[in-house]
Amino acid sequence: MKKQAVSFMLCAVIAMVITPVALNVKSAKAEGQGCYKSFYSEDYNSGTKIAGENEFEHFPIASMCKIMTLLLCFEEISEGRLTLDEKICASENASGMGGSQVFLEAGADYSASDLIKSICVASANDSCVAMAERIAGGEEAFVQSMNERAAALGMENTVFINCTGLPGAGQYSCAADVARMLRELMKHEEYFAFSKIWTDKIVHPEGRETEMANTNKMIRAYSGCDAGKTGFTNDAGFCLAASAMRGNMRVISVVIGADSSKTRFDRTREAFDYAFANYTNKIIFEKGIPLDERCPVQGGKISNVSVKAKDDVCIFTSRNDHDEIFYELEFDRIKAPVKEGDAVGKAFIYKNNIQVAETILLSNENVKKISYFDSLRKAAEYWIL
């Protein structure tokens, strides 16, 4: 009871002293809608901050640590060192993990796909350790890789001591860092095959089944939400990192230390609603769509070539702003022959005269090199004229 009273007093103090950024969260707390320790939201494409409170403060994040565990799993797959159908033997150490689990059988083989699915859906600690042992030979070495990857991503306010998020001294992160690692995880398209699962089961080798239900209730409760990770321990409180997409705009929201599960989901819903209502991504280039401009080609059967953007380019902006957005093209000195898909230059995008993005320009067609006889024919046509 004493701990509950202290927590309540801390929430009240936080509610009084935090100045909201962009969102009127102070009034929401005053109306008894719950409190939390930290919050952050951003645009996925640009990484631009939308709102935040204590987003760089150090807090335990419970099972949101598994975002980094999953990131290393999918990077292992991308590098070709792991396949989803590979069979992985669950050690006695892995099967004995406490907390959230799917009750792996020691000595039994499970597919990497099932283990990853159980991490995404059921936040399975035993599956995390099984994957850590497969990838790095042990959890300790795997945690070292987690910290190295965090450093490479610029996560300056994060330290991992395990791959599960179970309580431990010296393990912490911050809302902005959690958003950064979720953003990195979502670059792996395979992840979404698991993150959107609502209910499923894992079948153990001897036929026993463990039912699973997604701990991220936003998957069903909020239109466009298709990714995220929950977390809870007594020290961390209720946590949630989630992402939702509508149209061409994707938003990431992170809540740490909420006083209830309802609060973390309500706060996330509020963050999504605010972002989609007040911001937009203006489309500058669509991947593969030809531009009006053409690139000059030397020594080709035609003198210029149609070009297209290598990537989609959208500029994050407030719906109420009247930003001046324009682009400039810089073509390379291109000589025939040219193949469709060859890089021929770059496009630089500016917002209010400040460069905010760039993309490579690709040839949209083939251009053959002019032959000697083509040259003679062109010269003859010139003299005839």
Where are each of the predicted segments found?
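Hydrophobic alpha-helical segments and their boundary regions
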Residues: 4, 9, 36, 88, ...
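Amphipathic, positively biased hydrophobic alpha-helical segments used for protein targeting
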Residues: 18, 58, 73-74, 80, ...
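Domain-terminus/edge residues, biased toward the C-terminal soluble/receptor-binding domains
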Residues: 155-156, 167-172, 176-385
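Hydrophobic alpha-helical membrane context
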Residues: 15-16, 78, 279
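A general lysine-centric signal
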Residues: 2-3, 66
